[in-house]
């Protein structure tokens, strides 16, 4: 079948409860146990035996990953990875290499790890308006990608303090909520990060601009994009993607 299981450390749903996302070693333990359940129908997890006897086939396990350590972990233990490090050519190449490093460290074939890039998307004939509509999503991507550390993530030194402030002031209760008045959207403007975050995490602009951006990613090695529609009119956006962007890549 086409089903796969995606696992992440926990984002707004966890932090809104006052909890903390899972650490990498917790992720490793959990993912290894889940994969063993699908292959051996039995696994040890946190000192207990778990059994899952009904699966007819192994479901691929993917994880979300943003930095060098999590991307290497994905290469070590996962079938695939959803990459949130960024979309620029150098970041695409970095992510691929980190995943390949992890696979080699685990004695796996690096070419067998499926790689998808998470892309916040708003295709519009009015790029300025599209960018305004997408600010809260840019804040969310930055907060998630940089939450634990900026190390190894190519954040320009002159922007590091501003990124750290975004992390400190990010409002999880307004996670990815639309509206110019939302705190997270305003933060992006107040900190002067809008253009940088759009270039790093998003596909925003006219259809021609988006096509050119995807081609640059493909030239750097990206093969699969997970597009998330950002904006108040999602049916219009989906139609724009279908009619004006995707035909260039079929």
For each feature predicted by the language model, list its residue ranges.
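Hydrophobic faces of well-ordered beta-strands that scaffold small-molecule active sites
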Residues: 3-7, 61-65, 81-83, 113-120, ...
């Amino acid at each position: 079948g086409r089903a796969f299981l995606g696992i992440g450390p926990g984002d707004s749903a966890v932090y809104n409860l006052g909890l903390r996302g899972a650490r990498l070693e917790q992720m490793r333990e959990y993912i290894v146990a889940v994969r063993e359940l699908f292959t051996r129908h039995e696994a040890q997890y946190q000192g207990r035996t778990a059994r899952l006897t009904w699966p007819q086939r192994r479901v691929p396990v993917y994880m979300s990953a943003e930095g060098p350590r999590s991307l290497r972990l994905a290469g070590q233990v996962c079938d695939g990875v959803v990459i949130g490090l960024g979309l620029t050519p150098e970041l695409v190449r970095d992510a691929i290499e980190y995943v390949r490093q992890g696979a080699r460290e685990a004695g796996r074939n690096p070419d067998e790890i499926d790689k998808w890039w998470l892309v916040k998307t708003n295709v519009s004939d009015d790029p300025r308006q599209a960018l305004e509509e997408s600010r809260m999503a840019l804040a969310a991507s930055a907060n998630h990608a940089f939450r634990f550390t900026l190390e190894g993530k190519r954040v320009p030194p002159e922007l590091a303090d501003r990124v750290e402030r975004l992390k400190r002031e990010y409002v999880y209760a307004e996670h990815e909520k639309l509206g110019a008045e939302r705190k997270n959207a305003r933060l992006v403007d107040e900190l002067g990060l809008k253009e940088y975050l759009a270039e790093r995490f998003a596909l925003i602009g006219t259809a021609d601009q988006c096509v050119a951006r995807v081609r640059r990613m493909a030239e750097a090695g990206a093969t699969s994009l997970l597009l998330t529609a950002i904006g108040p009119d999602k049916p219009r956006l989906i139609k724009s993607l279908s009619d004006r962007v995707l035909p260039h890549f079929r």
